[in-house]
């Protein structure tokens, strides 16, 4: 499974949104109505699934689905 697909799966699962409503351009807060607790849970899930640590500083920069995909792809390489 690609990083993009796995990130989208996590977002759908964690935020309870329809898969059709999620694409790489969506903002977690503005488009997908995530609150601060949702964002914290998303970051924790990304860390667990991708076996990496995301600093608080980096986490604050991850505003869209694509931000997370790009970040994780860079970390994997």
From Swiss-Prot:
GO terms for cellular component: cytosol; membrane. One of its GO terms (biological process) is lipid A biosynthetic process. PROSITE patterns: CARRIER, PHOSPHOPANTETHEINE. The keyword Lipid metabolism applies. SUPFAM superfamilies: ACP-like. 4'-phosphopantetheine is transferred from CoA to a specific serine of apo-ACP by AcpS. This modification is essential for activity because fatty acids are bound in thioester linkage to the sulfhydryl of the prosthetic group. The modification O-(pantetheine 4'-phosphoryl)serine is found at residue 36. GO terms for molecular function: acyl binding; acyl carrier activity. It is found in: Cytoplasm. Keywords: Cytoplasm, Fatty acid biosynthesis, Fatty acid metabolism, Lipid biosynthesis, Lipid metabolism, Phosphopantetheine, Phosphoprotein. Pathway: Lipid metabolism; fatty acid biosynthesis. Residues 1-76 form the Carrier domain. Its main location: cytoplasm. The keyword Nucleotide-binding does not apply. Belongs to the acyl carrier protein (ACP) family. Carrier of the growing fatty acid chain in fatty acid biosynthesis. This is Acyl carrier protein. It comes from Protochlamydia amoebophila (strain UWE25). The gene is acpP.
């Amino acid at each position: 499974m690609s990083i993009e697909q796995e990130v989208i799966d996590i977002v759908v699962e964690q935020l309870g949104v329809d898969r059709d409503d999620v694409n790489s351009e969506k903002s977690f807060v503005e488009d997908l109505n995530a609150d601060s607790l949702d964002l914290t849970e998303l970051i924790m899930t990304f860390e667990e699934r991708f076996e990496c640590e995301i600093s608080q500083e980096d986490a604050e920069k991850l505003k869209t689905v694509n931000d997370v995909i790009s970040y994780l792809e860079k970390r994997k390489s």
